[in-house]
A protein has these predicted regions:
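A SIS-like phosphosugar-recognition module
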Residues: 1-304
Length: 304
């Protein structure tokens, strides 16, 4: 989303474990970006080697200096998030989003897609993110209260559109990793193709309903997302909506509203994921789960 929007370059996204087995079409004019917190992830490393073998340049986004992936890449963007002890990634994921935004911004500038004024505006928005994250973190007591009300649920559904859909996937992953609750991330626009059948009065549905009023596409997706919330409510689902501050339209139709500071559309995911991480944390604690060392999982997956 970020690179296509800011640099107007076509982008494909794939799992490292799937990439090498589909015989990808690559060449010297293709850049393969590999993302790994540890830099030792077996599937990602194998995907990088496959890309290099086919003549593609590789760029690593990694947290660990000197790791295998960084040594084999043509270039590296280090996230410098510091050691991440818990198995479930939190700050590393957030810093990866930031690194991808900076990469997209750089590509947009060098390709002449972004003018100087737009670039400066986006940089200023990025510089505001730490303070806005502090605001999100200050709402932690609310996330704890939400967890108290929801920790007995057996299933969760996370919905998002556009750039917010990957955050729905990540939010669902965090919850299932550390609380052992079945959770599914889904494109909000696909609800009629299956997920609607799951909705009842016992299903919490987390909906990413933020918006950037300055972006026409954001406003359109927002209106469609509000419609999705109304669909869930019509089926008696429990809606937890993540909304931007000052927005009462989505908040009014939801059961619970998590407010985050306003930002430009492509930076909203960085602010959205933190409440979902904290909600997963508090639910896991309520359920008596080991948040740092979830069962059957390892921090660095070094075997296929």
């Amino acid at each position: 989303f970020m690179i296509e929007k800011l640099a107007r370059m076509p982008v494909e996204v794939d799992y490292g474990s799937e990439f090498r087995y589909r015989d990808p079409i690559l060449g010297s004019d293709t850049l393969t970006v590999v993302i790994s917190q540890s830099g030792e992830t077996a599937d990602t490393l194998a995907a990088q080697r496959e890309a290099k073998q086919k003549g593609s340049k590789t760029l690593a986004i990694c947290n660990v200096v000197g790791s295998m992936i960084t040594r084999e890449a043509a270039g590296t963007i280090y996230t410098h998030a510091g050691p991440e002890i818990g198995v479930a990634s939190t700050k590393a994921f957030t810093s990866q989003l930031t690194a991808l935004f900076i990469l997209a911004l750089y590509l947009g500038q060098t390709r002449g897609v972004l003018d100087e004024a737009t670039s400066r505006c986006l940089v200023q928005e990025l510089l505001h993110i730490p303070a806005r994250l502090e605001t999100v973190l200050s709402h932690d007591p609310m996330f704890e209260e939400l967890a108290r009300q929801l920790f007995r649920a057996t299933d969760f559904l996370f919905l998002g559109r556009g750039v917010h859909f990957p955050i729905a996937l990540e939010g669902a992953l965090k919850l299932k990793e550390i609380s052992y609750i079945h959770a599914e991330g889904y494109p909000a626009g696909e609800m009629k193709h299956g997920p609607n059948a799951l909705i009842d009065e016992e299903l919490p549905v987390v909906v990413l309903a933020t918006r950037d009023p300055s972006q026409p596409e954001s406003r359109i997706l927002y209106e469609k997302t509000v419609s999705n919330i109304q669909e869930v409510k019509a089926r008696e689902g429990i809606v937890i909506a993540v909304v931007t501050e000052g927005d009462d339209e989505a908040a009014r139709v939801a059961d619970h509203a998590i407010q985050i500071p306003a930002s430009t559309e492509l930076l909203l995911p960085i602010l959205e994921i933190v409440p979902l991480q904290l909600l997963a944390y508090h639910i896991a604690v309520r359920r008596g789960c080991d948040v740092d060392q979830p069962r059957n999982l390892a921090k660095s997956v070094t075997v296929e």
